[in-house]
Amino acid sequence: MKDKYIIYFISRTKANMIKFIENKLKENNLTELIPTHGNILTALYESDKKLTMKEIAKKIGKDKSTVTPLVNKLITLGYIQKEKSITDKRVTYISLTSKARDIEDTFNFISSQVRETAYKDFTPEEKEEFLRLLRKLNSNFKMENEK
């Protein structure tokens, strides 16, 4: 039975979380954004400064080649902007625009709804244990991939 396999549950949970986020974006008239844009916006909101593509990729745990099209889309949508470093023309910084700042409270509210839903009916101990096990699972695959 498929339900016995952890990968099945992880996959279904991810799909359900994405659908939940898509619904929340729609409810808040942010339909031009997709869930994966959230990682980039979060990195920029939390740093509260300009970041390079490399720094964004590292913060969200993705390859630069994966981040580039997402950043380009956010630029097209007007949420972020690129600017060249004054001291080193090889370096390009990414920063939030006023449009992104205008949705920051809504974005944070959606993020809190995701967390609340994820941990609904979890005791504090269950939450800690769940996070510990997820970190361990992630570490197992990360170590194998780095061989």
Residue ranges and their predicted role:
Residues 42-46, 108, 135:
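Short, locally clustered residues in the helix-turn-helix/winged-helix DNA-binding domain
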